[in-house]
Amino acid sequence: MSFFTTNDLVKINFHDYGIQLNQPLILIGGYSSSEVTWFAQIETFVNAGYRVITYDHRSHGDSQQVDYGLTLHRLAMDLKELIDYLQLKNVVLIGHSMGAATIMAYEELFTDENVSAIITEDQAPTFFKSADWLNGQYGKTLTELSVFI
C-alpha cells in the first residue's frame, strides 16, 4: 500500500503494478467502491505489457476519510495530482461509474497531453431526471430532490 498527499492534505491510497517503463493504465472505481473492484483485471493487463495503477478516491477504501473536497472536480484534481506524482506519460484512463464521471471532469478541467486514451463504462449522462433523460436518480429532477435536502 502506498500513499500520496493531495494539495489539500488528503492521503490517497494507490497501488502500482507492472514495469514502470510500460504504458500506464489508471483504473478508476465508482461511487462507494475501492480499488479492490479492479483486482481481477490487474494480472491480465500486466501480462499484456501494461503498467497498472489503482487507487481509492478520497473517503473511499484505504484513502483518508474526509468531509471536504467531495466533488467531481476535486476528484479530477486528485487524479491529476496522482498522474503528476507518479510522473506518468501516455496514460490510458479507465473509469467505471463515478470513475467515468471523474474522467469527464478531468477532461473538462485539464488539457493534458499525458493522457492518450479514455475508456468509460456504466456512467449515466446525468445523475438527475430531465426532459431528455428519464432515468435519473430515484426518477426525480434536481428540483424535486432538493425538497428532501
Regions found by a protein language model. Give the residues of each.
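Structural signature of beta-strand start/N-cap positions in the alpha/beta core
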Residues: 24, 51, 89-92, 116-117
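Long, low-complexity, intrinsically disordered N-terminal extensions of eukaryotic proteins, enriched
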Residues: 1-2, 147-149
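N-terminal cap/lid segment of alpha/beta-hydrolase-fold proteins
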Residues: 1-12
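Active-site loop/oxyanion-hole signature of alpha/beta-hydrolase fold enzymes
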Residues: 7, 47, 54-94, 98, ...
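Flexible "cap/lid" loop of the alpha/beta hydrolase fold
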Residues: 104-108, 114-148
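A generic local structural motif
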Residues: 11-14, 39, 79-81, 104-106
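Anionic, Ser/Thr-rich low-complexity intrinsically disordered regions
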Residues: 27-40, 59, 64, 78, ...
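Conserved HGGG/HGGXW glycine-rich cap/lid loop of the alpha/beta-hydrolase fold
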Residues: 10-65
